[in-house]
Amino acid sequence: MAPLAPRARLRHAARGGRSGYNAAMPIRYTPSELDQPSLSEADGIRYLHFGTEWVQGAMLIRDPARLVLEYTAQMMAWLLFLEPPREQSIGLLGLGAGSLARFCLKHTRSPVTVVEWNPQVTAVCQMFFRLPTPQRLDVHHDDAGAWVADPARAGDCPVLMVDLYDAQARGPVRDSVKFYRDCRRVLGEVGVLSVNLFGRHESYGRNIDNLSKAFDDRLVLLPEIDAGNQIVLAFSGPPLAITPAELLARAETVEAQYGLPARRWARALTRHAVDGVLHF
């Protein structure tokens, strides 16, 4: 989920209707297959929406695997700490416009597992957002909370990227301590969770608190981007202690190999060094 797209006429991509919501009722959003995808285009970029101007994903038409939105690039900051898995999967909770799936399929050899509630979103991604269909892509149409709660998923994905927003953009639709603990179990013994939050949204503090409880305060916050997104990394496994020089060296490798602004991320993280050491 990202802020509003440039002004452009929205067009429906699939039939359906919006799920009901009463703003006066303090209820949690329930995913609905009736959330209706729609499209817009501006300046060579195709955007995905759910019936509003809020952007659910984007694709550069001439280069579909490029990460157009800055926050989606930041979601890949786990590469500073882990190599892409070979046998286990990179996990994505929320498909959006398929940006992260396309990137991971092009730039890694990892299996990619996607959990997306709405089959219409998957269909739109295949029709309009050039979502590949290799054997190593596995899409589950399921509630992300139920999927991670399944004990059979334990250790399946040492990397898990979470981007779970609804059409109302009211914050992540799954954000309880239990949900994040279940995510940690999916990571297994060693792993990194990457979560997209809105730093200026009322849900932000609750998510940070719940992530801290689930991951024993082992969180890293990347700098908030101008659009308001803030990516949080949470760590599972033995404590990690590295020097700023080691992190910057790794960032150079990531930037050269994947074309991501990893050195900028690393420089921001080095400010948190204590006595010349970074602890994660």
Predicted regions and their residues:
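Short, solvent-exposed secondary-structure boundary motifs
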Residues: 20-33, 210-214
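The AdoMet/dcAdoMet-binding core of the Class I SAM-like
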Residues: 30, 42-43, 48, 63-185, ...
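Short, positively charged and aromatic/hydrophobic N-terminal segments
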Residues: 9-12, 18-21
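Extreme N-terminal basic, low-complexity initiation segments
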Residues: 1-10
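A short, flexible beta-alpha/helix-coil linker loop
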Residues: 53-57, 165-168, 193
